[in-house]
Design a protein with these regions (language model features):
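Substrate-engagement module of ASCE P-loop NTPases
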Residues: 102-113, 149-150
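Post-Walker A helix-loop "phosphate-sensing" segment adjacent to the P-loop in P-loop NTPases
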Residues: 1-9
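Short, solvent-exposed loop/turn segments at secondary-structure junctions
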Residues: 15, 85-87, 123-125, 169-170
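NTP-dependent small-molecule kinase module
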Residues: 125-184
């Protein structure tokens, strides 16, 4: 709102293609399952199944990035992803995918890069107060993985911002984001 532009919020991926469980269970049942189940609870351990699942969702990114670009970006919208492709790199288990990071990382090279990428994190105890999806060890591992990923991605470019922000205080976090956007 401070930038005086319309905003659209997308979750995790463009969602041009439905989640896979919609194809097998139907839309309502899949939606109920998504709401009632915690992330990272899938039982998939197969490389082939993971590769097929990842390929399906990657296709959604490949096609969807252009749909989002023409539908929103060119019309002046600010597009905010709550999560993005980075989950496939660092937390593919969340999508019931078990693949080496090298495979999912390569895929990022062929996607349009958001101009600004912010990883908002907090210490494990704060996160556990908000929601109990993961244990403290997993939260710490994921936080370290995302911080490391963002540091490495930032080293590869000057045209895209990859910034990790400790999200302890909302006002400070928002101020940090706005300053970063205005500065660029």
């Amino acid at each position: 709102k401070q930038l005086r532009k319309p905003v659209v919020v997308l979750r995790h991926r463009p969602s041009i293609l439905p989640i896979l469980s919609v194809l097998t269970k139907g839309k309502e049942k899949a939606h109920l399952d998504t709401i009632s189940n915690l992330p990272r609870q899938g039982k998939n351990g197969s490389f082939l199944s993971s590769l097929l699942r990842f390929s399906y969702y990657y296709l959604d990114y490949l096609i969807g990035q252009f749909v989002i670009y023409f539908k929103y970006i060119l019309r002046g919208y600010v597009v905010i992803y709550d999560r993005y492709y980075f989950d496939f790199i660092n937390d593919s288990k969340r999508s019931n995918i078990v693949l080496p990071k090298s495979i999912t990382t390569i895929g990022y090279r062929f996607l349009l890069k958001p101009e600004f990428n912010f990883f908002l994190f907090a210490d494990a105890k704060t996160i556990l107060k908000r929601k109990q999806e993961l244990d403290e060890t997993t939260i710490n591992e994921l936080t370290n993985d995302y911080n490391f990923l963002f540091q490495n991605l930032q080293l590869t470019t000057n045209s895209t911002v990859y910034k990790s922000i400790n999200n302890e205080d909302l006002e400070t976090t928002l101020s940090n984001i706005i300053k970063t956007i205005i500065k660029k």
